[in-house]
Amino acid sequence: MIFYTLEHILTHISFSLVSIGITIFLITLSVDEIIGLYDSSEKGVIGTFLCITGLLVTRWAYSGHFPLSNLYESLLFLSWSFAIIHMFPYLKKQKSYVRTITSSSTIFTQGLVTSGLLSEMQQSEILVPALQSQWLMMHVSMMVLGYAALLCGSLLSVALLVITFRKALKIFSKKKAFLKDSFSFVEIQYRNEPSNVLLSTSFISSKNYYRAQLIQQLDRWSSRIISLGFIFLTIGILSGAVWANEAWGSYWNWDPKETWAFITWTMFAIYLHTRTNPNFQSVNSAIVAFLGFIIIWICYFGVNLLGIGLHSYGSFNLH
């Protein structure tokens, strides 16, 4: 009873922190000047991380097993993993764009957990026989950590694509505007003044330089985080194969979850291969990562909606 009450309190605290965090995050998107609000949002993510840690420990204590037996618990662990990834750049006081991705991911996932959509799974239950194994913690934790890192890395790639394509659209619109303004007497007079030419050129070159630097950093950090996630995913799949052989007598059964996990692994293996090819630009790799981002959510949520296969114990119904 004490554990249940404690979990209930921690759930409400995390929900409150997430609600405040979402509000602050939306305000900072429109008002960049308020730095204090952004710092509050960052600290809110850390508070959420502590609450989620308390939730996981509490569920572990009164259920007697590591809390990764259904979708609700795995989402809790996913938001905890996002918060862990968020902690590293936060403690180093750098890479604010990485923290923006991880904090928004934590807020979104924890908001989904506390929204009531998965209320049927919030009550801890006795593990089904297939899950009563020491491999549960190893396999599922590695898979979820892999998903978290791959999702964060993919979102950085999506940000890279947005910046790149916005730049391409601006260049295209500027070319059209230049052709239109070339016949304007006022525009010609403005361009002929040396001071205006220097100011305009220096502003554009400085802006392009910082944009290029940002694209480079997004590309580098995306590659690093995806590489880490790929290692976790590989360990998770291999440990799952060993567990499957012990439980069902076969390393691989090609049920929906296993099939989509393999597709996810293949997609990010292709991504890492493109990183080794000097002929591939960062945009091409980012497109592969974006496709991988979609595939992860199909593997994580889409397969659970089917409710079939050897992994159907983690499924849920939307009714």
UniProtKB/Swiss-Prot annotation:
InterPro entries the record matches: Cyt_c_assembly (IPR002541), Cyt_c_biogenesis_CcsA (IPR017562), Cyt_c_biogenesis_CcsA/CcmC (IPR045062)
Keyword Chloroplast appears in the UniProt entry: yes
GO MF annotation terms: heme binding
Compartments, record wording: Plastid, Chloroplast thylakoid membrane
Chief subcellular location: plastid
Keywords: Chloroplast, Cytochrome c-type biogenesis, Membrane, Plastid, Thylakoid, Transmembrane, Transmembrane helix
Family under the similarity heading: Belongs to the CcmF/CycK/Ccl1/NrfE/CcsA family.
Protein name (record): Cytochrome c biogenesis protein CcsA
Gene designation: ccsA
